[in-house]
Amino acid sequence: MSTSTQNIPWYRHLNRAQWRAFSAAWLGYLLDGFDFVLIALVLTEVQSEFGLTTVQAASLISAAFISRWFGGLLLGAMGDRYGRRLAMVSSIILFSVGTLACGFAPGYTTMFIARLVIGMGMAGEYGSSATYVIESWPKHLRNKASGFLISGFSVGAVVAAQVYSLVVPVWGWRALFFIGILPIIFALWLRKNIPEAEDWKEKHAGKAPVRTMVDILYRGEHRIINMLMTFAAAAALWFCFAGNLQNAAIVAGLGLLCAVIFISFMVQSSGKRWPTGVMLMLVVLFAFLYSWPIQALLPTYLKTELAYDPHTVANVLFFSGFGAAVGCCVGGFLGDWLGTRKAYVCSLLASQILIIPVFAIGGTNVWVLGLLLFFQQMLGQGIAGILPKLIGGYFDTDQRAAGLGFTYNVGALGGALAPILGALIAQRLDLGTALASLSFSLTFVVILLIGLDMPSRVQRWLRPEALRTHDAIDDKPFSGAVPLGSGKGAFVKTKS
């Protein structure tokens, strides 16, 4: 940018169409967060009415994780072939239909299937909305686009909690799911009133349709085997998270089977760039493993170890959720200022200073605990707002929506594993110590993976002929594309 351009406030670099595109996607992501957390809010009511066991009730939450990876792949491929806008609208309709179906569910099986649909729609919304906004904004503002967008999910969760307190006591739990009709109306408005993403339009103008991830996996020469592996992965995930398996060896074996299948899909769809894709799945996996123990078990910690009443728990959780939402926006500014990877590492390092005090302070001062959680979540959880920008930069426009959707949602299985890890460690330690130690140690793994740019580094080690030296979204160089100690002159931009 020129000096005169740099002196202009960042928001004036955006025209009305770009703001409209962002606002629409942000509202879609808010609705996504709203719909996703509804089941957690009414789980006890659903369990009581349907006469479910604790395992069956918990499986209604896990169901969304079982289907997310396939939704990210399928709807991401739709976004790569037909445009980001159509994929985003389709995703909103899908998770809204699933939410509405939960309201009409006569029993466990119907609600479980509806939750599978919600998981697919949620995954598609993540990949399509993120690529839509990022590709619609100027290159030097794309970390802000990513961070601001992801903040919508946290806001949606806060809105859901407030709506729950107003609706359920008066009209019952089903009425909460009937609100799912509203996003469908919003999606129909989106279809007519928002433009297509600029990067996608430029890439596809006057060209033949691209060969998507779905084409490669399910229409290629290995389609039969891939279909069988898809069913095998779905069945394995169901047995792991909803099948009440007691044998740890069997669960580990099924988890290994899923890992092999997902890596196989990445190798087939990414060709020579498969090392980058596999490492990105690991980055996301560990990002969920360090953050979700706190996300999932913090309410339990506050109620059991600190003996807080429900009102106090709600206040503390507000600080935590609001901190994450603010952190997404702060992460956007940091990313555009320092660069995506450097901002990520600096924010996580700062969050490490706070994680021990959060669980060491005890419950004597609620406000101090709330403030510590606010800043810890702002720095540790909120920085994940720029994760779509980080992942998307490793994929070309033709494969970005499916690549981002599949990679992120496979790694998101860490969100289902994280509470289990926290609970297992808590059998030997108190819950606060378990959460602090797990988050503290695994955050360092993410710092190393991102700070050393391991996706590019492993690509250079294993398949250097397909190495990309620059970010496909903002053209910034990848530090892992050259050996450590090499100067800036070592970066020679490769054709994407």
UniProtKB/Swiss-Prot annotation:
Known catalytic reactions: N-acetylneuraminate(in) + H(+)(in) = N-acetylneuraminate(out) + H(+)(out)
GO cellular component assignments: plasma membrane
Record PROSITE patterns: MFS
Domain of life the protein comes from: Bacteria
SUPFAM superfamilies to which the protein is assigned, alphabetical: MFS general substrate transporter
Subcellular location: Cell inner membrane
Parts of the chain that traverse the membrane: 22-42, 58-78, 86-106, 116-136, 148-168, 170-190, 224-244, 247-267, 278-298, 313-333, 353-373, 374-394, 406-426, 431-451
Annotated keywords: Cell inner membrane, Cell membrane, Membrane, Sugar transport, Transmembrane, Transmembrane helix, Transport
NCBIfam families listed in its UniProt record: 2A0112, PRK03893.1
Family: Belongs to the major facilitator superfamily. Sialate:H(+) symporter (SHS) (TC 2.A.1.12) family.
Protein name: Sialic acid transporter NanT
